[in-house]
């Protein structure tokens, strides 16, 4: 069976535009909140049965054209030697942001990090992938994912504080230490994706969310070479690859050369301009998730406007410019998904 999402990743013709949304499994869903009333966030991430349950729920509830593994970009950090916790948040269940108890600050800290062995260190993720595939019964494909080296490093180095000051200072003051850190995080990303695909993931998205914090020369030295290596590793698995970032519209042409099948863009650029600047790859995005918080008729109209601007050329996937926000009405999500499915060029 050829899924329209996978076909769009390869810029092949599809019967309708595929749609999925980042954070489509999350706190805006009553079904997700019901699960989270019983377990903490990390407990959820470490339960294959619950991983499958919350991953598949949005497919049943909204009819998305792809599922994405429910996990976290930092889930492997404890296996690398870092003390990861999530703040208690409003409900006391780990709803807050991540905290690293022993952040990476020195070369000795970097040298002490261990590249994880997913089968031994992250079996619940791989078992979760297998459980999802069984539950989906090939209705839609499953996307695996990891965090990009810079984004994961921003949490590992900053320790959970807002901003990027310590990490960016490391780039300039101790570039060899920064490269050593990115090397280990790149290796960690590659082994995770390889094992996710071996377990059944049918595509791979790299969440390099905070890439827009870097100047072009720093991207060239500290990011793009590592992202290209991850893209090559995904290519060897045979599944499509997606690179997601925000604040990087100035660098689209360069990002198109990293080796990814799909470039996911944020809402800060017109989608027709993004497609024109990315002629050799598929494009994903770039609906502003805040629209889903507004009037339903506006949300639907803007989705249709985006589809018209994206055009009929194969290789477009409807998604958000970032994740679904807490408090988003589920009715708006369903209305937009239905509008995308109903849209046609004939």
Swiss-Prot record:
Subcellular location: Cytoplasm
Gene that encodes it: hemE
Leader sequence segment: none
Complex and partners: Homodimer.
Electron transport keyword on record: no
Pathway: Porphyrin-containing compound metabolism; protoporphyrin-IX biosynthesis; coproporphyrinogen-III from 5-aminolevulinate: step 4/4
Record's catalysed reaction(s): uroporphyrinogen III + 4 H(+) = coproporphyrinogen III + 4 CO2
SUPFAM superfamilies registered for this protein in UniProt: UROD/MetE-like
Main location: cytoplasm
First-level EC class: lyase
Role summary: Catalyzes the decarboxylation of four acetate groups of uroporphyrinogen-III to yield coproporphyrinogen-III.
Protein name: Uroporphyrinogen decarboxylase
